[in-house]
Swiss-Prot record:
Protein known as: DNA replication and repair protein RecF
UniProt keyword annotation of DNA repair present: yes
The keyword Nucleotide-binding belongs to this UniProt entry's keyword annotation: yes
An example Gene Ontology biological process: DNA replication
Residues at which ATP binds: 30-37
Gene: recF
Length: 368
């Protein structure tokens, strides 16, 4: 899939923008604070209905206005699709082909994106919540049912935690009802995650071995707070541990086990990647990003759109070459932001270059 056209009205520092793109590489050049990252954020938002930079939708609205409109014309294997998101003080409206979507799980996945931004380099050593978010964003695009089950899990989790905080003593019967619901949704969330990580590991290891010239292997491990064994279902084990932890959870006023506590670990040649070098971290994240692209295509039959936000300068020539070889080979539409072409020595011919200045975008008259 690829974005043929994007229109922004009152988004960040863009009062109005209408642009069309190459199905291959699109490079956005400009000084800092001109709107390059805002532009990629808009594509990300149109795909996932959320920003990767802020939780406050009001920050996305141009200072002179009270509403935001984003529309995109997306070419998929199955045909052209029009996406639209409107924001106002009344909330958010999402549309596919002018039809309002009642549920996010009906909208997300229509246009898949993979974002590679400087903050992704913190994925290995950052908080577990970053790694859970990484899993959730990918899985939500690949399997819309995952978002449905995760949303229901979080709703029941909020109810259970609220009860634990307010209760003066344990009502075993009431807690049993919440436990059953939490275990039911939570088990399916964990099953989806485990399957996803197993598939991602194979793709990531292939890319990592290519980047390291066969010197390093990359493995991933889903770290669950629920203790598993092969004889009993995840649901039964999760439910048992929830019941076992009633007193502890009541004392701590929160739920101590479940997918909201889970994590993801990375290993290079069997060693925890927390102890890897900076260069190895860059190779690991690059391998993951390329694996995301490969896996989305393998599981859905269509390519995602790749957003590279000021990260090419973080990669040496070898890593740049591996990345660009992948996107060209797989025919992935790619958006790159940069302050200069000087460090992009590996860019091929046939790219479209845009210049970004104070919320305006001008395309070069020629395709380079």
């Amino acid at each position: 899939m690829w974005i043929k056209e994007l229109e922004l009205k009152h988004y960040r520092n863009y009062d109005h923008l209408l642009a069309s793109f190459s199905s291959g590489l699109n490079v956005f050049i400009g000084n800092n604070a001109q709107g390059k990252t805002n532009f990629l954020e808009a594509i990300y938002f149109l795909s996932l209905t959320r920003s990767h930079r802020t939780r406050a939708d009001k920050e996305l609205i141009h200072f002179d206005h009270s509403t935001v409109s984003l529309t995109g014309k997306i070419q998929r294997i199955s045909g052209t699709v029009d996406l639209e998101i409107n924001l106002s003080d009344k909330g958010r409206v999402t549309k596919i082909n002018a039809l309002k979507q009642a549920k996010l799980s009906d909208y997300i996945g229509t246009m898949m994106v993979v974002l590679f931004a400087p903050e992704d380099l913190q994925l290995v050593k950052g908080a577990p919540s970053l790694r859970r978010k990484f899993i959730d964003i990918d899985l939500g695009q690949i399997k819309p049912v995952y978002l449905f089950e995760l949303s229901h899990y979080n709703h029941v989790l909020k109810q259970r935690n609220s009860y634990l905080k307010s209760a003066q003593q344990i009502d075993a019967a009431f807690l049993a009802v919440l436990d059953e619901q939490l275990a039911s949704y939570g088990a399916r969330v964990m099953e989806h995650r485990i399957d996803f990580i197993n598939a991602l590991e194979k793709e990531a290891n292939t890319h990592h071995q290519a980047i390291s010239n066969g010197l390093e292997s990359l493995s991933l491990s889903y770290q669950s707070s629920v203790v598993f064994d092969k004889k009993t279902s995840i649901y039964q084990q999760f439910l048992h541990q929830l019941e076992k932890n009633h007193q502890k959870d009541f004392f701590r006023k929160n739920t101590s086990v479940g997918p909201h506590r889970d994590d993801l670990a990375f290993y290079i040649n069997g060693m925890n990647a927390n102890f890897a070098s900076q260069g190895q971290h860059r190779s690991l994240i690059l391998s993951l990003k390329m694996a995301e692209v490969s896996l989305m295509k393998a599981l859905t039959g269509d390519n995602p759109i790749l957003l590279l936000d000021d990260v090419m300068s973080e990669l040496d020539n070898t890593r740049q070459t591996k990345l660009l070889e992948t996107v060209i080979k797989e025919n992935v539409q790619t958006f790159i932001t940069t302050t200069s072409l000087d460090h992009l020595s590996q860019l091929p011919e046939g790219i479209r270059i845009f210049h970004v200045t104070k919320g305006t975008v001008q395309v070069d008259s020629d395709i380079h």
